[in-house]
């Protein structure tokens, strides 16, 4: 493991030098490729540096203990030695987790779909809350977020179903844990008796596919155009700019009406179709995965109940790992980092155990 880490650090230093080379800076395609490699190695190298620093400090303290005769100084050195030694297993475990091979789709952008489920108007309002939560999370991480489709429910402004494209660094690797059924428990504004209602919304996170990943034959597509309309039926477009594409072999139907031109809506609809087909392909490849890992990443499975948002108790519980937080308002405002880090750690640990079996 240490040889592998030393090689990674050497490569990281070489990349750092290359990224300051004017010739490489001038070649944007090559610069982006090298910069991604550099970013991918950064966390590993930083963890390795902490591990090496810890080992050196242990050696220094052991040397001090061998020479020290003063009882008080020796006791302090022993205390420091025990603290440093206690840190070693955690640092080693962190390195093992970071060295695990990444899923091939982790670095990709995503298409996210949110649909109101059981619960009528309350489910649509909750789907709107989730849409805003993910938009805020993307904003906090500096990602680009584009709304592809928004179908309004009976309640003005509430989301029946929506889809959006999120692009940035390692988006799928971070967002993939959000696929599944999200449940909400709260008292609706229209509830006069103060009773708590339960409703749900489903989320699907699909890795974005490039044209080279998925071959789509034009003959397999049926493209329909229709007039797009604003929320609540307002600002109905007189020109058929909205696009619906049906992929005959799979039966998948996608639509986009958020852009002003038919060409832009068609491009976005094709992006959604590629993502759905690529997700199916990945699901077929991953059938051999261990049950634990499949339960962590639903790959767009809308039937898996993953999380409950309880408003009366200001509680969020992720049922896959037993994670509970009482910071519900902050989470709904896009502060998902702690929750997602816990999910990532759980999945990485499961993969490590899988590898060691």
Curated annotation (Swiss-Prot):
The entry's comment on post-translational modification says: Methylated by PrmC. Methylation increases the termination efficiency of RF1.
What keywords are assigned to this protein?
Cytoplasm, Methylation, Protein biosynthesis
Output a single Gene Ontology CC term carried by this record. cytoplasm
Q: Which domain of life is it from?
A: Bacteria
Location comes to:
Cytoplasm
Which chain regions cross the lipid bilayer?
none
Family stated for the protein in its record? Belongs to the prokaryotic/mitochondrial release factor family.
Q: What biological function has been recorded for the protein in this entry?
A: Peptide chain release factor 1 directs the termination of translation in response to the peptide chain termination codons UAG and UAA.
What HAMAP family would the database entry show? Rel_fac_1 (MF_00093)
**Protein's name according to its UniProt entry:** Peptide chain release factor 1
Q: Look up and give the organism this protein is from.
A: Prosthecochloris aestuarii (strain DSM 271 / SK 413)
